[in-house]
Amino acid sequence: MTKIERALISVSDKTGILEFARGLAAHGVEILSTGGTAKLLADNNVPVIEVADYTGFPEMLDGRVKTLHPKIHGGILGRRDLPEHVAKMAEHGIGNIDLVCVNLYPFEATIAKEGCALEDAIENIDIGGPTMVRSAAKNWAHVAIVTDAADYPALLEEMGANAGALSRATRFDLSRKAFTHTAAYDGAISNYLTAVQADQGLAGEPVRTLFPTRLNLQVVKVQDMRYGENPHQSAAFYRDLDPAPGTLAHYRQLQGKELSYNNIADSDAAWEAVKTFDDPACVIVKHANPCGVAVAADPLSAYRLAFATDTTSAFGGIIAFNREVDAATVEAVSAQFLEVLIAPAFTDDAKALIAAKKNVRVLEVPVEAGANRFELKRVGGGLLVQTPDIKNVTLDELKVVTKAQPTRQQLADLLFAWRVAKFVKSNAIVFAAGGQTAGIGAGQMSRVDSTRIAARKAQDAGLSLKNAVAASDAFFPFRDGVDVIAEQGISAIIQPGGSMRDEEVIKAADEHGIAMVFTGNRHFRH
């Protein structure tokens, strides 16, 4: 145990700092501080010694040099268990500093502001703070380093239970947290500066490249998993330090077994798909592919339509809703075997009802607009990085390329099918009618094979394709896919266009009296 007798507090984010400092003072801890933090403590009657008074050296260079002094860093880095360290510190009048409480200039918040000039960014790169954090973290055997306001209450509680001392285990945990903190901070600075053109001046907002020269990823482990995609693979789940709003990482598990690797991968696919719809929607996913999607007046109706698309594939799947789920919906869903149930919220009656299915994993995820900044795909020895596919085509962007003109209902169905196709593994073909998928063909090496599978799925489900529509995630390389679609009685097609055989494909649609629209963008998904 290390008794805390002297602390240095210098924080940018002052959340909770008064209460923490008062708690330290109540334990008889001498408090050193700088600038605005020292003023805040003094103004609120917390005993404090200015660092400049303690070191005998004034702050200078507009506050750039405050704590970079041997009396500060010697007091932090000195080892109490080495006689030569103790002797040298005594010789130079350097006292021990037992606790350092520091958080850093808000660099990321600064560069996130619209119009942030390079000069403003540079001025918000903390120097003294990280130096103290790293010094204290290195000497964790004798010094406690505090970088997170959330830790203040627990530390005061531990000191209260141990006559003002903190355990070795606590100090080590704080050290690990501190090094993670400075790594994330330096990573953000590196990402920013390596994306800025070297010849730009300090004034004005700099032009930044989308992809920095060096990409620093900061993630934190949520859990170790029993295994990965297969039982012989090891796995863990990590989330971003600051996950994008509305993403799966914000989930709250209400019940059920621990999420598996495949549960999380499939849940992400289901959630990303369902949250893209404005109307009440249900998405059922199996092996990261939608096997049923529908929009309707309410979640229960949407579920019934989505489930009807492919009752066989839905077995053991993931079911996601974009609206609060009630008891009636849970009762319907509970009639099938499922792995995970996801929604923004569940009524109390729904929670009570699903509790009987103890193995079902139930997740609440807030519906918010947001997407990951980057999508990452590992390849041998490297990483593919791209922006996410968040493009949703609008009615005004559609180009009718056939003699037949789509009706208003067909246009609505085409936009629905197109939105679904974005989440189906390529080659993707989606048949739909009335806000319901009627057949989904996924993941085939040839587009015509995906078309045939979608047709067979509709037939197996007993769903009529007469006057339904079809969506293709990429262009038709030949007319054969259109011919197969026509055989099903489908009346309209949506696809990107852009094939060297577009004219041949359009001619096939005209021969069959099918309306066809081009979107101008594709949705490959691998």
Curated annotation (Swiss-Prot):
Entry-linked NCBIfam families: PRK00881.1, purH
Keyword Kinase recorded: no
CDD domains in UniProt: IMPCH
Family designation: Belongs to the PurH family.
Single Gene Ontology MF annotation: phosphoribosylaminoimidazolecarboxamide formyltransferase activity
Lineage of the organism: Bacteria, Pseudomonadati, Pseudomonadota, Betaproteobacteria, Neisseriales
Any one Gene Ontology cellular component term annotated for this protein: cytosol
Biological source species: Laribacter hongkongensis (strain HLHK9)
One Pfam family cited in the UniProt record for this chain: MGS
Pathway assigned to this chain's UniProt record: Purine metabolism; IMP biosynthesis via de novo pathway; 5-formamido-1-(5-phospho-D-ribosyl)imidazole-4-carboxamide from 5-amino-1-(5-phospho-D-ribosyl)imidazole-4-carboxamide (10-formyl THF route): step 1/1; Purine metabolism; IMP biosynthesis via de novo pathway; IMP from 5-formamido-1-(5-phospho-D-ribosyl)imidazole-4-carboxamide: step 1/1
Residues of the MGS-like domain: 1-147
UniProt keyword annotations, A-Z: Hydrolase, Multifunctional enzyme, Purine biosynthesis, Transferase
Catalytic activity reported: (6R)-10-formyltetrahydrofolate + 5-amino-1-(5-phospho-beta-D-ribosyl)imidazole-4-carboxamide = 5-formamido-1-(5-phospho-D-ribosyl)imidazole-4-carboxamide + (6S)-5,6,7,8-tetrahydrofolate; IMP + H2O = 5-formamido-1-(5-phospho-D-ribosyl)imidazole-4-carboxamide
EC number: 2.1.2.3, 3.5.4.10
PANTHER family: BIFUNCTIONAL PURINE BIOSYNTHESIS PROTEIN ATIC (PTHR11692:SF0), BIFUNCTIONAL PURINE BIOSYNTHESIS PROTEIN PURH (PTHR11692)
Domain notes: The IMP cyclohydrolase activity resides in the N-terminal region.
InterPro entries, sorted: AICAR_Tfase_dup_dom_sf, Cytidine_deaminase-like, MGS-like_dom, MGS-like_dom_sf, PurH-like
GO biological process: 'de novo' IMP biosynthetic process
Name of this protein: Bifunctional purine biosynthesis protein PurH
HAMAP family: PurH
